[in-house]
Amino acid sequence: MTNAYECTTQPQRSQAADPLRTRDFRLLVAGLGISLFANLMLRFAMSMWVLDETGSAAAFASILTASILPTILLSPLGGVMADRTNRRTVMVALDALSAVTVLVCAAIFSAAGFNLAAIAVMQVVLAVLDAMETPTVQAALPQMFRSHGEDVMRRAMAVVNVVNQTSTLVPAVLGGVLYAAVGAMPMMGITIVGFGAAAVVECFIRLGAPDRGDVGRVTAVDDLRAAGRFLTRERPHVLHLVLICAALNFLVTGYAEVGFPYMVRTVLGFGSTAYGLAYGLVGASGLLGALVGGRVARSLSMRRFPMAIAAFSLTILPQALVMTIPAGGVMRLAVLTASTCGTMIAITLANLIAVPAIQMGCPEDMTGKVMSLALSASMCAQPLGQITYGWAYSVYPAGAVLAVTFALATAMLPPVAHVTRRF
């Protein structure tokens, strides 16, 4: 009897020892991964379909750009919902609505064939639903792990980042093969099944209703005003950290997402094969950063945040130098790729420090709203970075743009150090 008792209680002890080995967290991660995989698989299929039908790569890019504004405006409503209702219910409803949206559009395409307007509406709706789900997931993590401290929160964020990176890389690898083999419509079927499966999985997550805090707030506007007062009056250092993260997103989006492909393809003149290999390495480095972050999560306290930003700035310097001095194309490609991989690792570690600090710096009834406002700020910075760097690379030499980027990243260190001392 003693041996049997020990065998049955050992899993409970190991589960208690590691809060991440819980059924609810595993279901949350599974639902998130399936939903993200379905979303990105659909985006890839639609981009290929639009390109085949219109011959214009800019058409689908314009659709994605048009979805940014409603996403920024409506994302805070997701934060309000996350703090007002059961977060499990919100996640299930949003994934179910995503499945219904794709199903309706698939029926339209089956009856009428290719329709660019329907694709545009579908992508805008899905972008808004995804932006509303993100703060819900980010608010669910503190609800699960707040009592275990920031170390566990950082480990949980690392797991979520690994899932995000994997779910981003897999559709990029499989998307082309599937589209060539079966076409867009069967891939829409895969997406519908994916969203539906995510909703079913999330139904089994056990999450209670969040603490409403001040029940006097009766409208979404009241909730957002309360979040604004909280950030500006009660916890201004949290607001400053949100703004720093938005500034980082501006730099990384501009120099990595815009500058890296421009320098490899246009400045250095490499073909799609070399760029695809380099892009794959950069994507894998983000996954590596999340894995490393999970291993060293206990040491990633806020006092390490300035070191992460300093490491990020140092990854830009070799690129500025190699694009300024005389060097061969292969050497420049190697330095650009290796340094951008370093950038992705440094930024991933910085996110693992900053995001849990923001989450843990908010009370239960503010987490969703604050995270949604942080998401909106980052989304505002993203197109600004794309536009600014697109203009800069077309006017100035790549080495000069990178040198200015290095200077801006270095200039962030004093305010970063100041904010760090407040946590």
Spans of features found by a protein language model:
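Hydrophobic alpha-helical transmembrane segments
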Residues: L116-Q123, A127, V152-G213, G280, ...
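Small-residue hotspots at the loop-to-helix junctions and early N-terminal turns
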Residues: L42-A45, W49, T54-S62, A158, ...
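Substrate-agnostic recognition of the 12-TM MFS/MFS-like secondary transporter fold
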Residues: L27-R43, S67-V80, N86-S98, A118-A180, ...
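Primarily residues marking transmembrane-helix entry/exit sites
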Residues: R21-V29, L116, A120, E234-V242, ...
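Membrane-helix boundary and inter-helical linker elements of multi-pass secondary transporters
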Residues: R21, D52-E53, D83-R84, A112, ...
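A single, central transmembrane helix in multi-pass transporters
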Residues: G33, F44-A45, V182-G189, R229-A290
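C-terminal transmembrane bundle of multi-pass solute transporters/carriers
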Residues: Y5, L73, L77, R84, ...
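Juxtamembrane intracellular "pre-TM" segments in multi-pass secondary transporters
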Residues: Y5-F25, G208-L243
